[in-house]
Amino acid sequence: MDVLAEANGTFALNLLKTLGKDNSKNVFFSPMSMSCALAMVYMGAKGNTAAQMAQILSFNKSGGGGDIHQGFQSLLTEVNKTGTQYLLRMANRLFGEKSCDFLSSFRDSCQKFYQAEMEELDFISAVEKSRKHINTWVAEKTEGKIAELLSPGSVDPLTRLVLVNAVYFRGNWDEQFDKENTEERLFKVSKNEEKPVQMMFKQSTFKKTYIGEIFTQILVLPYVGKELNMIIMLPDETTDLRTVEKELTYEKFVEWTRLDMMDEEEVEVSLPRFKLEESYDMESVLRNLGMTDAFELGKADFSGMSQTDLSLSKVVHKSFVEVNEEGTEAAAATAAIMMMRCARFVPRFCADHPFLFFIQHSKTNGILFCGRFSSP
């Protein structure tokens, strides 16, 4: 699992940097579900297509493929287990053109390792029906939060393989914020721009630390049951968040967020209430990272999946997060942010300027979600 956590964590931070190239934009995605979805495709890839995928997914370090898929099997079992005090639903499915004769061995492996189905649709003669079918499936899996994953025209009669990957998360804070303390404050989007946000406030004991080399505070907000944590990285007001992003590697992330190395102290926390809904067409992102062959007919080698000549037509990722006084819900809408109130000598953690946030699964160290809040 540790090897897999490192591979997934490395991929997560590479994605964060790629998706976050435009500094003014908010970012939110689930690297774990993207890794799962792509690893499933990787299972059917061969030759150079597989080599490129292993490279961007950081599977090279882990020595071979078989243990990767078993690793995902354990990870998904752990993350999707029932009886938790949070709700997390990860839905992966490959939709293939039915004339392509997908190998039963590949379908069986999808089910065994990834709890995922390979479903055959008629893209050639019923493209709109296929699109609606995929959207309905996603909506069901995400409690209706992600309703229109594939927009009209996003699949066509030439579509052969659509990889769909959706996540829904809802969790309450271990210690909730009192709604009466929430008030409108200004969020410093940049040196010369401020926007109003609804700022939540709580004074309590939390784990936190300060990383001197990047002038950044790190705060850990646990969810009920303490199986999941939100980790917030907030640079000092004089430090640009880009500096933090540039320095961030998986090794540093692990070192900086080690709970046993943090102080538990009373702190005044101001955190914006926000909602983010982000949708990414992952093809250009994955191509930029070096995964090119998979998308090109003639170059793509998915002979472990089907004997038909196949390429990946579409990789869509959509995710939602809502952070409020009760906790977090992956849900659709727009965002809001925060500022601080008068302090005694209690340290302040005042997220009234851009910050990074991560939702991590404690037991597996898996980064379930990554985000950047730049602007309400």
From Swiss-Prot:
N-acetylmethionine modification, residue list:
1
N6-acetyllysine PTM positions read 195
Which residues in this protein are found as Phosphoserine?
Answer: 151
Q: Which GO terms describe its biological process?
A: cellular response to osmotic stress; sensory perception of sound
Q: Which residues form a coiled coil?
A: none
SUPFAM superfamilies attached to this UniProt entry = Serpins (SSF56574)
Task: Please describe the organ and tissue distribution of this protein's expression.
Answer: Expressed in keratinocytes (at protein level). Highest levels in skeletal muscle. Also found in placenta, cardiac muscle, lung, liver, kidney and pancreas. Expressed in the inner ear hair cells. Expressed abundantly by normal mast cells in different tissues and by mast cells in mastocytoma lesions.
Q: Which disease is it linked to?
A: Deafness, autosomal recessive, 91: A form of non-syndromic deafness characterized by progressive and age-dependent sensorineural hearing loss. Vestibular function is normal.
Q: Quaternary structure per UniProt?
A: Forms a complex with the monomeric form of beta-tryptase.
In Swiss-Prot or TrEMBL terms, this protein is called Serpin B6
Species of origin reads Homo sapiens
